[in-house]
């Protein structure tokens, strides 16, 4: 025993001595071209809820390659209907629809089927013929008449290896054993042939297993090869902690199985990828991008939480979060040449500890773009064989980063860490990246030397502090979250439910000045019913000075958001404390970042004439350009001079313009008219109400009645940008872990023309947000009417407009 203990101590000492000597490093070979970069990893399962939720601008910027969406009029979820959002899928190679989504509850008629099994009355073949195939017929006939049918993939069974429909029932449990497998195979053949009899060219995807398991895949492929029912698209899911390290093994094994049974290589779509704790965290998701680019697989992010934010890739309907920036930079690399990347890393199986990257060479061979993650210390990037590109010996290096700031924390721009000019020696360049955060991704660019580039070596970079490392007070405790968090094990602080419960944390700033303290928090529903969702009132104490802050409801504790406090702090050590006041909440981490006034806003060049501008708030911005003429902003048409002001909505604005331009914050305005709820004429069921926080709003407009009308006088004909301040907290359906939020819509009518405008759920009747839409108005008076058309209804339920507090009518420029 003594020898064993001594041996273990020696191992521990050796293990602990490794990190000190280890230098994380990544090598990019600019001469080793692997193929063309795609956006096949940019796919989503129920990521789009309704038309413009999320917005076309924020989705178009990502160049989505595939989606999995609900079958038309399906009952599985109240949103995600493929017909409602198909206009935002122009970039998609594949549009997958789950036919079983016609049924409500998870897993599709689970309780009904299990009750019949207990009674001994369930016959899977009878259920298939009498309940499922009539629905399949109805849906296929409808879908085959749609303009997107050539890209459509019918997923006829989803995760049927759970054995609910076809499994063998033994002693109260269902089993996907040999009997279950044969039942599924027969059902597959019946359904496959049935669809082909109606639509011979239909693409059918399957088997749709919940994971990749060699035996299950082999059996399925053997059966389909021998029975003339091989799917056109191979589908499985990757939802486990081993998905990333085993991704290539699964791919290679599947290709081996195809060859074994003489099947031509099929396109592969992993229609659900990512664990709950990974989705939304860019540091984790980059590993999936790398895996899919190497294997050529399409993938759709799993739906673990909400259906209205691209599976945690947007902060709301139109604002980026940190994960959006990862997928946007990935989209910018589409069409470029992928470069070989080799990593010197310590940990193969823990993604956050695995330094890795994705690199491309621009189409004109003069810029190397890299996205890297996996280190909480500075690391080296060795770019080799630049002499094989069109870069010369003088280059500009730019290093940016986005930190994970909560699932719904808005991140308006990456943080610029360094920018400098460098010399390439013998075709090689070494770059040191000041990595400090495992939950960040780093964007590194090597481009031709820019003589006008501002030299930046930021030493006062953002730093993260984990609340679980603070001093817990009262009954506060740490715990592991099922969702994305920062830090290591037990990365959340909860239990702050009564007076005295809280946490105290020390933090340090290197230099005196203004700082943003970004608090990543979660706020669940204390009441247990949707209408009980409310703010948490929290006592926050910074260096002994107390104030009460309000943390908005995030539906679930671990659906984290961001609350930002700006403080003037002297250099040195500081303390921040949080204590319960009213309502429960949880804390993840705090990112301390030097404040920089956002004078110029980011403008991303997408093509010759298309740009994406990221505005921090709704309002007017100064446009500076060497060009003047016609402009389109999110489809609203107008014209501008080379020095002008334009109205932008908060978040992403898709702009078409004939020249390059810059945008700056400005206080000036063009035409802008605000209409308050109390100034609007109501009729029918519509009501004017005031909530406990003093907000006056219009409510109870539905497809069963209620109308709001107001007049606005505008100076000229044209497209106007209408920004509405609203709240929406509706919910429908039931699911074990997804919150089935409903996106309310209002029908806006002017000049005899109507449009249905969807508004994203704000997760509380007391949380008001803005959304902006376009309205064509005529010079002079315009009567605008707000109703609800009833054009979109879930399960024939009454459809409502959102709570409306105010609207502003804004000229484009």
Where are these regions (language model features)?
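Flexible loop residues that form catalytic
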Residues: 49, 72, 159, 212, ...
């Amino acid at each position: 025993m003594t020898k064993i203990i001594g041996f273990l101590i020696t191992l521990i000492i050796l293990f602990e001595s490794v990190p000190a000597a280890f230098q994380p490093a990544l090598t990019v070979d600019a001469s080793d071209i692997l193929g063309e970069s795609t956006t096949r990893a940019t796919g989503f399962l129920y990521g789009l809820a309704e038309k413009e939720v999320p917005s076309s601008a924020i989705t178009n910027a990502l160049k989505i390659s595939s989606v999995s969406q609900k079958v038309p009029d399906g009952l599985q979820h109240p949103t995600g209907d493929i017909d409602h959002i198909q206009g935002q899928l122009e970039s998609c190679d594949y549009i997958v629809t789950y036919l079983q989504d016609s049924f409500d509850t998870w897993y599709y008629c689970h309780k009904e089927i299990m009750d019949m099994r207990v009674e001994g009355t369930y016959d899977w073949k009878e259920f298939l013929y009498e309940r499922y195939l009539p629905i399949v017929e109805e849906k296929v006939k409808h879908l085959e008449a749609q303009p997107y049918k050539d890209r459509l993939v019918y997923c006829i069974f989803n995760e049927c290896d759970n054995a609910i429909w076809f499994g063998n029932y033994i002693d109260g449990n269902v089993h996907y054993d040999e009997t279950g497998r044969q039942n599924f195979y027969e059902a597959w053949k019946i359904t496959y042939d049935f669809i082909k009899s109606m639509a011979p060219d239909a693409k059918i995807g399957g088997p749709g297993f919940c994971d990749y398991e060699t035996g299950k895949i082999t059996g399925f492929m053997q059966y389909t090869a021998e029975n003339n029912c091989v799917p056109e698209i191979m589908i499985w899911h990757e939802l486990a902690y081993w998905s990333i390290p085993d991704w290539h093994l699964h791919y290679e094994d599947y290709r081996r199985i195809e060859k074994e049974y003489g099947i031509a290589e099929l396109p592969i779509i992993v229609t659900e990828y990512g664990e709950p704790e990974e989705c939304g965290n860019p540091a984790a998701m980059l590993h999936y991008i790398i895996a899919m680019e190497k294997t050529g697989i399409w993938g759709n992010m799993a739906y673990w939480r909400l259906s209205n934010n691209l599976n945690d890739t947007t902060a709301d309907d139109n604002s980026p979060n940190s994960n959006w920036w990862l997928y946007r930079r990935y989209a910018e690399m589409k069409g470029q040449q992928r470069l070989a990347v080799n990593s010197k890393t310590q940990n193969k199986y823990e993604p956050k500890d695995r330094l890795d990257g994705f690199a491309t060479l621009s189409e004109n061979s003069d810029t190397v773009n890299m996205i890297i993650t996996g280190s909480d210390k500075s690391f080296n990037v060795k770019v080799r064989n630049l002499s094989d590109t069109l870069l010369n010996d003088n280059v500009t290096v730019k290093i940016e980063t986005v930190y994970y700031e909560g699932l719904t924390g808005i991140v308006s721009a990456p943080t610029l860490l360094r920018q400098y000019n460098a010399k390439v020696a013998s075709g090689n360049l070494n770059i040191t990246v000041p990595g400090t955060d495992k939950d960040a991704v780093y964007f590194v660019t090597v481009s031709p030397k820019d003589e006008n580039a501002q030299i930046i070596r930021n030493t006062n970079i953002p730093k993260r502090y984990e609340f679980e490392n603070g001093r817990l007070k009262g009954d506060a405790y740490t715990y592991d979250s099922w969702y994305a968090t920062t830090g290591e094990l037990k990365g959340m602080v909860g239990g702050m439910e009564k007076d005295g419960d809280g946490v105290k944390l020390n933090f340090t700033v290197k230099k005196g000045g203004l700082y943003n303290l970004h608090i990543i928090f979660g706020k669940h529903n204390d009441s247990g019913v949707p209408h009980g969702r409310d703010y948490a009132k929290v006592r926050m104490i910074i260096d002994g000075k107390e104030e009460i802050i309000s943390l908005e409801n995030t539906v679930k504790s671990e659906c984290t958001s961001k609350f930002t406090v700006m403080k003037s702090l002297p250099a040195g050590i500081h303390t921040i404390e949080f204590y319960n006041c009213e309502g429960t909440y949880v804390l993840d981490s705090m990112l301390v970042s030097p404040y920089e006034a956002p004078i110029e806003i980011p403008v991303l060049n997408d093509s010759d004439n298309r740009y994406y501008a990221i505005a921090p708030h709704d309002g007017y911005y100064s446009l500076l350009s060497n060009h003047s003429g016609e402009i389109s902003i999110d489809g609203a048409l107008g014209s501008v001079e080379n020095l002008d002001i334009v109205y932008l909505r908060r978040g992403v604005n898709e702009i078409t313009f004939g020249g390059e331009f810059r945008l700056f914050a400005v206080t000036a305005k063009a035409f802008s008219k605000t209409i308050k709820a109390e100034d609007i004429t109501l009729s029918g069921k519509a009501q004017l109400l005031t909530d406990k926080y003093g907000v006056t709003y219009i409510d109870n407009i539905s497809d069963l009645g209620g109308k709001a009308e107001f007049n606005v006088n505008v100076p000229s004909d044209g497209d106007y940008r209408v920004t509405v301040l609203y709240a929406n907290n509706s919910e429908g359906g039931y699911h074990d872990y997804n919150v089935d939020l409903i996106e309310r819509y209002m029908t806006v009518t002017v000049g005899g023309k109507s449009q249905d405008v969807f508004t994203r759920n704000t997760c509380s009747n007391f949380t008001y947000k803005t959304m902006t839409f376009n309205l064509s108005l005529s010079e002079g008076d315009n009567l605008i009417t707000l109703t609800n058309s009833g054009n979109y209804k879930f399960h024939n339920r009454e459809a409502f407009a959102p709570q409306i507090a105010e609207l502003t009518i804004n000229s484009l420029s």
